[in-house]
């Protein structure tokens, strides 16, 4: 992979929370593709959610705040309160899990998977899109920068995730 022009924001504890499921399945598409499946750790026949909760607490601020906002918080000595400030912002935007506000668990997990699995740094999270300019109509779950070039020949693609809810 080519050198990254943008660093990833995700705390690198991903592999302690999610385990990749090995399989032989493919999507049978013409273009290069990968199908990756992950699951949480299982203890006594039940999912262990504690590591997931801790992982999300550690990364919530990175999802909610832009890099510039995070830098401002660190410079002001507020780096220990980033997660609390992130929770407060999410609550202001809408009820936890409310569709379209950027506070749904799936939207936050999308950010985590894009950053870790694709190694595609966040440009804008769903939450940042939703709150930018006061608009609440973001159709993308996030915008990430994917490196597709080789060493010495950098190339990048913008990656969007858009989900269609069918009732």
Segments and roles (model prediction):
Residues 101, 105-138, 144-147:
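Extended, Lys/Arg-enriched charged tracts that mediate electrostatic binding to polyanionic substrates
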